[in-house]
């Protein structure tokens, strides 16, 4: 194939451009050195703090609880989980779920010389996080945390069966329990987080240990109890079925009274613990559902109350505005009536004054403006009076020549 580096058109060595990996733009000036960038997606990190010196020396205190069961005793060991450790496990699980849910998509990019590359599209991290949160199992995370915290614990029952010892080098714990009874074996029932469902910040890892009673102590009750005698009846076809059913029931009762093996006892114990955990989980879920329902009911009542108060306040403001409008409309009417009364009194005094005045004009108009009203006042007509000046003017007018002032040609 034709290589650009060996082309006769190129006389100088091409410069090498160092393009950083985090560059997101195509540089047209350096087509030869262009290559697809490495895809960097957002990672989930826990807010880890620097460990203090005091944390390295001191460990979390261990709590003990002993409960009696029909098969023996249950010893519960619990210790507090640091919040940083819990958030670390949760973030790691979220990262795994995000990687499992991530489905990459690509688009084709072409460079200056026509070379095509597949470039990964940018993923929607928020959508991936939401999908991962839906599949997040806190119980599995709690079980893993408890398993890691109690990993180095050594639980041992002595040969006599009356003393139990617990040893942990990591937590610097060595505890011996003196037992009042003789136990045959010890086993681990299960582990997990005690308060995984509630939203409290304090979480406690829980390890349950089962102590199996000795077979003689378990079978004591069965040996002392007298067995029911088998009723012998005559050989009769009508009573054969009844006798067979009774004998089967007695055999089942005898089998139930027989002591269970150690494996069967452990299986039964674990199953009972699982059922108890399921019942407690259901009761907690029902309690949480009731609390949620009550909270929603209270919020609904509060919203209705607030809406009712807002409507009442709106009605009050509307009424007050209407009253203000009515008062503003009634005020000008009263003011106009008062001004009319004042104008009437002023007009009466003006008429009396105008009657006493004798002027040369025939008619005089008196306009008085007071307030918002305008009224016209007319003076009384005066008698016609002969004027001497007018007579002299008319007489001189009659004596004036009536010809043209232009001299006619002779």
Swiss-Prot record:
Location of region: Disordered: 223-264, 276-410
GO terms of biological process kind: amino acid transport; intracellular protein transport; protein folding; protein localization to nucleus; regulation of pH; retrograde transport, endosome to Golgi
Composition skew (Polar residues), residue ranges: 364-373
GO molecular function: protein sequestering activity; protein-folding chaperone binding; SNARE binding
Chain segments annotated as coiled-coil in the UniProt record: 243-330
Low complexity composition bias: residue spans: 334-362
Keywords annotated in UniProt: Coiled coil, Cytoplasm, Endosome
GO cellular component: cytosol; late endosome; nuclear periphery; nucleus; perinuclear region of cytoplasm
Compartments, as annotated in UniProt: Cytoplasm; Late endosome
Biased segments, Basic and acidic residues type: 233-264, 276-311
Principal cellular location given in the protein's record: cytoplasm
Functional description taken from the UniProt entry: V-SNARE binding protein that facilitates specific protein retrieval from a late endosome to the Golgi. Modulates the rate of arginine uptake. Involved in pH homeostasis. Required for the correct localization of IST2. May be involved in ion homeostasis together with IST2.
Subunit note: Interacts with RHB1, IST2, TDA3 and YIF1.
Name of the protein in its database record: Protein BTN2
Native species: Saccharomyces cerevisiae (strain ATCC 204508 / S288c) (Baker's yeast)
Gene designation per UniProt: BTN2
């Amino acid at each position: 194939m034709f290589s650009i580096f060996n082309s006769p058109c190129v006389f100088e060595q091409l410069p090498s451009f160092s393009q950083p990996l985090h560059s997101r733009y195509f540089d047209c000036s350096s087509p030869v050195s262009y290559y697809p960038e490495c895809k960097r997606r957002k990672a989930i990190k826990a807010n880890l703090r620097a460990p203090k010196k005091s944390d390295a020396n001191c460990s979390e205190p261990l709590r003990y609880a002993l409960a009696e069961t029909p098969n023996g005793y249950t010893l519960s060991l619990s210790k507090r989980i640091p919040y940083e450790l819990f958030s670390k496990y949760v973030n790691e699980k979220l990262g795994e779920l995000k990687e499992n849910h991530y489905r990459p998509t690509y688009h084709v990019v072409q460079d200056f010389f026509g070379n095509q590359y597949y470039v990964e599209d940018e993923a929607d991290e928020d959508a991936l996080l939401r999908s991962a949160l839906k599949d997040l199992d806190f119980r599995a995370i709690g079980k893993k945390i408890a398993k890691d915290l109690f990993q180095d614990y050594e639980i041992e029952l002595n040969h006599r069966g009356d003393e139990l010892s617990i040893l942990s080098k990591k937590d610097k714990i060595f505890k011996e329990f003196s037992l009042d009874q003789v136990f045959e074996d010890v086993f681990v029932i299960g582990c997990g987080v005690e308060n995984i469902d509630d939203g409290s910040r304090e979480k406690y890892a829980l390890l349950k240990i089962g102590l199996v009673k000795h077979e003689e102590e378990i079978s004591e009750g069965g040996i002392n109890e007298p067995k029911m005698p088998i009723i012998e009846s005559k050989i009769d076809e009508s009573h054969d079925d009844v006798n067979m059913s009774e004998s089967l029931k007695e055999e089942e009762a005898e089998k139930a009274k027989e002591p269970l093996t150690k494996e069967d006892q452990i299986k039964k114990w674990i199953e009972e613990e699982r059922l108890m955990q399921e019942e407690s989980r259901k009761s907690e879920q029902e309690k949480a559902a009731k609390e949620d329902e009550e909270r929603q009911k209270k919020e609904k009542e509060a919203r209705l109350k607030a809406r009712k108060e807002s409507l009442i306040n709106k009605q009050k403001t509307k009424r007050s505005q209407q009253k203000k409008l009515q008062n503003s409309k009634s005020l000008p009417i009263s003011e106009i009536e008062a001004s009319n009364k004042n104008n009437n009194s002023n007009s009466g005094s003006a008429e009396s004054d105008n009657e006493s005045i004798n002027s040369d004009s025939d008619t005089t108009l008196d306009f008085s403006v007071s307030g918002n009203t305008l009224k016209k006042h007319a003076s009384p007509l005066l008698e016609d009076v002969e004027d001497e000046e007018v007579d002299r003017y008319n007489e001189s007018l009659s004596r004036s020549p009536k010809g043209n002032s232009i001299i006619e040609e002779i």
